[in-house]
Amino acid sequence: ARSRYTYFASVAKKEGFEQIAAVFMETAEQEKEHAKRFFKFLEGGMVEITASYPAGIISTTKENLAAAAAGENEEWSDLYPESAKVADEEGFPEVAVAFRMIAKVEAEHEKRYRTLLARVEAEKVFERDEEILWQCRNCGFVLSAKKAPLKCPACLHPQAYFEPMKQNY
């Protein structure tokens, strides 16, 4: 998923969705950490892994969001619960816990992708029904409006750089 998401981020950026590109990249980094967690359970030597992998295609941001959401859904609803069950049956409770905890993250990834997909479909990525705070991802300029400006009044970057302001401090 990590590599696929980095490709999807490039498409989103080209299509003028800087925030969506950033979400794809953030998720790609989280997927890297999931892989690292699972990799640490391997104890060296040769390991035979039999699995199928969704090759998919790189398409539009809309289609990429839909594909990403579907993939995350499969991970949290089927793949990881089944893997946790097998780990429990084979006497690896710590591995089972990791699968269950990471499945919770994958459910959040799906939720985020579906929310962004709905906004792309409704053409509401840069517009809301009520006033919100919009922040320029480039320079930090903030304004209250229903719609992000076509161009940042401070740094002149295009609308693509605006996202709803979030405060995580």
Predicted regions and their residues:
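Non-heme di-metal
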Residues: 1-169
